Design a protein with these regions (language model features):
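Anion-binding and metal-coordination hotspots
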Residues: 1-248
Length: 248
């Protein structure tokens, strides 16, 4: 039996806990991440607002997404880097190789170079793969006599590392992850999760009444409006009570 599901995606102001924009998408990671670009562009176009930082989970930590935030939008990504380079077989991960920006090469723990231009082509090539990576290869001669071969590339003649063309953005995100501001963003992310919990438990929006993407968007937009009004009413009541106490 076919099953159709939609997800609501919020762009919120973490300080005020106000929902700034809403986007309905099919319930899969690719569409949900893409909705973030849509909402950020739409809010900037309509209201001339652009976030200084964006907090999210690992789904938003892909190389292309990080490059878009840092290089195109100048937004600090407070998200974990989506990194699959760590190895689980006790062999050396790519993070244990030192990157030399000037030489455009990696250096292994024993000091040998991994370069992207070892294979010579008659016609110049960009060397960028379909996965938006560049392959850096060690010399087979260096690897054959290396004392660390069993820990580095036991099943291949030489070591290879795939480096993303957006690796600079990934490195910048890793640097941000070590800052106090990043830790604060991780704590504040629960504000978003609370809105989703309120959506299901209080507003009972666990089943949509309208059909199709347009219907889902309308229902999610109305629900977000109700949440914003509820939040604004609480703030107005709190401000009124504080004013009355001050007068008294």
């Amino acid at each position: 039996m076919p099953f159709f599901a939609y997800s609501t995606n919020y762009l919120i102001n973490l300080q005020a806990r106000i929902i700034v924009d809403v986007e309905a998408t099919p319930a899969n990671r690719t569409h949900e991440v893409e909705s973030t670009r849509t909402m950020i562009d739409r809010v900037e176009r309509r209201h001339d607002l652009k976030p200084r930082r964006l907090a999210g989970d690992t789904a938003y930590g892909s190389a292309a997404m990080l490059a878009w935030m840092i290089q195109e939008k100048e937004i600090a990504p407070h998200v974990p880097v989506w990194d699959k380079t760590a190895r689980k077989d006790n062999t050396l991960s790519s993070s244990e190789f030192k990157w030399d920006e000037l030489a455009n090469e990696y250096r292994c723990p024993t000091g040998h170079a991994l370069r992207s231009d070892r294979r010579k082509f008659r016609n110049p090539r960009s060397r960028v793969t379909k996965a938006d990576t560049i392959i850096y290869r060690a010399s087979q001669f260096d690897c054959e006599g290396c004392s660390m071969k069993d820990r580095c590339c036991p099943n291949t003649p030489f070591r290879k590392i795939a480096r993303s063309i957006h690796e600079a953005a990934r490195d910048e995100t890793r640097r941000i992850a070590k800052t106090p501001e990043y830790n604060r963003s991780c704590r504040e992310r629960k504000k978003v999760e609370m809105l989703f919990a309120h959506l299901k438990r209080i507003l009972k929006l666990d089943r949509l009444r309208l059909r199709g993407p347009s219907g889902a968007h309308d229902e999610f937009l109305m629900a977000a409006t109700a949440q914003n009004l509820r939040r604004m009413a609480k703030r107005l009541m709190l401000g009124s009570q504080q004013m009355n106490q001050a007068v008294a």
